[in-house]
Amino acid sequence: MEALQHQPQNITLEQYEQFPEDYRVEVFDGAIYNMSSPSQAHQTILTELLVSLRSYIKEKGGSCTVFPSPFDVKLNDDPLTIVQPDLMVICDKNKLDGKRCNGAPDFIIEIVSPSNPSDDYIRKLY
């Protein structure tokens, strides 16, 4: 994940919402970070985990929902922090507003990429 040359450095939610839908970024403490496209191996792992989690929740009669990335999670307003974990489970439907999850999901999975392990192990430990 590389920092974009984008102003202002302390981006607001209103500015974030003006980005095109296919503009893949995360915002940490108001700073914008570009997200690279996932690899085939990454997507294969994501799909297997998604199917397994969804099946397990249904089998146990759970009411939680599994969401794959890209799906925004807003963790903070000022400074803005919006992330897109690779996979998340959300049980509290009140956190969902039709656009994103507001607050921490109940469970997240981040698939570590060889191209950016420091981001996955350090910055993304929100």
Cite the ranges covered by each PLM segment.
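Gly/Pro/Ser/Thr-rich low-complexity, intrinsically disordered segments predominantly at protein N-termini
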Residues: 1-126
